[in-house]
Amino acid sequence: MHSMISSVDVKSEVPVGLEPISPLDLRTDLRMMMPVVDPVVREKQLQQELLLIQQQQQIQKQLLIAEFQKQHENLTRQHQAQLQEHIKELLAIKQQQELLEKEQKLEQQRQEQEVERHRREQQLPPLRGKDRGRERAVASTEVKQKLQEFLLSKSATKDTPTNGKNHSVSRHPKLWYTAAHHTSLDQSSPPLSGTSPSYKYTLPGAQDAKDDFPLRKTASEPNLKVRSRLKQKVAERRSSPLLRRKDGNVVTSFKKRMFEVTESSVSSSSPGSGPSSPNNGPTGSVTENETSVLPPTPHAEQMVSQQRILIHEDSMNLLSLYTSPSLPNITLGLPAVPSQLNASNSLKEKQKCETQTLRQGVPLPGQYGGSIPASSSHPHVTLEGKPPNSSHQALLQHLLLKEQMRQQKLLVAGGVPLHPQSPLATKERISPGIRGTHKLPRHRPLNRTQSAPLPQSTLAQLVIQQQHQQFLEKQKQYQQQIHMNKLLSKSIEQLKQPGSHLEEAEEELQGDQAMQEDRAPSSGNSTRSDSSACVDDTLGQVGAVKVKEEPVDSDEDAQIQEMESGEQAAFMQQPFLEPTHTRALSVRQAPLAAVGMDGLEKHRLVSRTHSSPAASVLPHPAMDRPLQPGSATGIAYDPLMLKHQCVCGNSTTHPEHAGRIQSIWSRLQETGLLNKCERIQGRKASLEEIQLVHSEHHSLLYGTNPLDGQKLDPRILLGDDSQKFFSSLPCGGLGVDSDTIWNELHSSGAARMAVGCVIELASKVASGELKNGFAVVRPPGHHAEESTAMGFCFFNSVAITAKYLRDQLNISKILIVDLDVHHGNGTQQAFYADPSILYISLHRYDEGNFFPGSGAPNEVGTGLGEGYNINIAWTGGLDPPMGDVEYLEAFRTIVKPVAKEFDPDMVLVSAGFDALEGHTPPLGGYKVTAKCFGHLTKQLMTLADGRVVLALEGGHDLTAICDASEACVNALLGNELEPLAEDILHQSPNMNAVISLQKIIEIQSMSLKFS
């Protein structure tokens, strides 16, 4: 027991944490027994590690690049900041230098002024102390010559015997001084143009020349120049009709004439010196207008001294009678009435006696209103080319023509419609309103300022008598014309009724005409000839110049005028029909020849000056088509469309420029095609017509200029404030986009004119007045949508015209063929659901990658309009480009069969010529020839009885579009076209075209409804 315990104790002494040390195993056989790694796996591991390393390197590289860029940007910003600071420093230095230079210049100017002032101060004392006996100035050679001439004339005057009766006005020194005194530079002095001041002249009695020498001073040449400049300024200021006279009095023509005669006889100096220099010779000079001469008469001084009485008593009356005493040949655009100079033998004798009396210097009885005694004189009035003994007759003729001018002025101002009556002879026949307007005006109406003599009372009475007789004749002729108008208007009304009898109308017309000719009095030869000519030409020349009339005061006169205007309205509008309109209505108007209306075409007196179409009494031909359609081809064009251009004026950056239509118009003129066509006067389309397709906001925005826009509601004009209408272009102009430029003043008018030209031309073709037509218009329109302007287009001319024809002229079915290389997205949008209009477009599509991106083959319409929208969308780009073969194949397989099935009443063609060869790829890039366009037009003329209207759309190569326009107009005229090449006729279209056509046929075969 004890031994067991001791053994346990021994075992417990061994350390528990120590392990027995085993020997190192150095055998290699155990390693060979371990599993071997597959080399493929090892390769993959290595590749993964390599990729990981590469990724780490890329990340490190990107980090380095980013760090480099960041540092580079920081350095760049620092460099820019340093440059800005350096520039600021340079600018500051430059400004300081400029300020220093300015200060130096100012200092230099001050020094120069100071030196000049000192120099003048040094020169003044010698001048102030100069002896008065010495000369103060040296006279110029001109002044010396004038002085010598004056002294010679003075000595000649002394040599001639002088008495109280032989003093002429031109040689009286005191009178010369009086006339010269009025050339002072006072504000009330008259200008050099011949108008006289309103104050009166006081002429002192005759004095000896030794006591009153007329020379006031001897002016040197610089003084003359200064005076002439000041006089010219005063003359320019006083000659303005807008400035009132400070004197306050009305200057009569008679007073002006009397002073002008006096002044012209005493002074004829140069314009530079005025009347301050003496006369050139002993005789007076002719006045500015060369209408009168004042010879030295025994009573010249008496005549001048009595001038004040004449002016005071008769100036106002004469002013009210004859407001313009000159230019009898001006007729204000109306034919002058022949003067009556051969009234009777007694009148001739009276004129002869008066002429003899005038030659002797004795005034006629009552010549100056009865205020001049018999001893006064009257200057001889000589006209150019007239002897002195015929002065009275020439003056009489002059006054008669002046009275006619006054009557014509009343006619233009709103008097009697055709033959106004003279207020001199028949004051009781003028309405109170008219009589009130012809009282003495406070401000004289503007007219030519002349110095012809005013008529005298005896001559005025003669004028009154002759004008009264002439007025009676004209009044009878006017009444006859009104009666003939009534009869002819009745005959026209009978023609419109089915049971009208032309023979009865003719007999009634002839009977009334004979009765009026019997009642017409026969007075003078000229009056009778005028009367007969007026009656004979009444039927052929129906119509007269309609002048705006002033409203009459009395109700009775207003009713009479209203009745007469109503009776004449139907008849007066007939001459305004254009020749093409009358030709189209030849079937309806053939019976009018029986009553004298066959001269309607021959006598076209007055053409309309408005841009709107002329109104007609007969029914509109579009409502009831004539039996035979017109045979003419119309051309619509207006120069207003040339003004639509960018303000930069560079046509190279803007392909849609004014040279397009200008070149086409010139080509048509050069080839003579324009002479074979009917020129159609264009007009601006109304906003209501534009709103047939476009929204009200769009039509107001692009259809009005800034002047018109001020009158519109700004809320309608601006619309959505968030919408941006115009933007600045790189060239400096404005535009809707980078291509569609906008001119604030002219673009709206040009766009409306383009629409109006197409409407006018299509209306005349639809009504039968024209066979077909071509509208040479710009800007184009087939890209313009309801509220969007794009692609050079603002208003869709063809779409608006189509709706106008359908709504206004009842054209039920219209075919629109778009030949432009770009798709007409605006036209498609306007008629996408409309079954009355078939739209066919041939355009480059390229799967939507060509502008405007629309026009896919599967866009066939919607609703009732499904199948009435056909897009011949070419694909495949320009490898190869489409040409004549492809377009002819499209017409043969799709356009012609579908159009014949549709059977349109009218064909509108969007004639875009940018598919022609010569256009760059961005603008088209196709290779269609101009000859092909002519043949395509000829094929379209087989539809709708030939009623085809082409409207220019795109096309920017000038030579190409001119050739195509010439070919199309030749086709419209029916001329022989240049044949296409044989290889084109027998060639097959390219594969891209075949694929496109097959796809279109497949799609349309399922959607066409009218087949």
From Swiss-Prot:
Regulation of this protein's activity per its record: Inhibited by Trichostatin A (TSA) and suberoylanilide hydroxamic acid.
Region ranges (Interaction with MEF2): 136-154
Modified residues (Phosphoserine): S22, S220, S240, S451, S554
Family the UniProt entry places it in: Belongs to the histone deacetylase family. HD type 2 subfamily.
Protein purpose: Responsible for the deacetylation of lysine residues on the N-terminal part of the core histones (H2A, H2B, H3 and H4). Histone deacetylation gives a tag for epigenetic repression and plays an important role in transcriptional regulation, cell cycle progression and developmental events. Represses MEF2-dependent transcription.
Protein name per its UniProtKB record: Histone deacetylase 9
Region annotation Interaction with ETV6: where it falls in the sequence: 218-261
Gene: HDAC9
GO BP of this protein: B cell activation; B cell differentiation; cellular response to insulin stimulus; cholesterol homeostasis; epigenetic regulation of gene expression; heart development; inflammatory response; negative regulation of cytokine production
Binding site for Zn(2+): C646, C648, H654, C731
Listed Basic and acidic residues bias regions: 208-219, 233-248
Tissue expression remark: Broadly expressed, with highest levels in brain, heart, muscle and testis. Isoform 3 is present in human bladder carcinoma cells (at protein level).
Polar residues bias (residue ranges): 185-199, 522-532
Region feature (Interaction with CTBP1): 23-27
Active site: H783
Chain segments carrying region Histone deacetylase: 631-978
Disease tied to this entry: Auriculocondylar syndrome 4: An autosomal dominant form of auriculocondylar syndrome, a craniofacial malformation syndrome characterized by variable mandibular anomalies, including mild to severe micrognathia, temporomandibular joint ankylosis, cleft palate, and a characteristic ear malformation that consists of separation of the lobule from the external ear, giving the appearance of a question mark (question-mark ear). Other frequently described features include prominent cheeks, cupped and posteriorly rotated ears, preauricular tags, and microstomia. A chromosomal aberration involving HDAC9 is found in a family with Peters anomaly. Translocation t(1;7)(q41;p21) with TGFB2 resulting in lack of HDAC9 protein.
Top-rank lineage group of the source organism: Eukaryota
Post-translational modification: Phosphorylated on Ser-240; which impairs nuclear accumulation. Phosphorylated by the PKC kinases PKN1 and PKN2, impairing nuclear import.
Catalytic activities: N(6)-acetyl-L-lysyl-[histone] + H2O = L-lysyl-[histone] + acetate
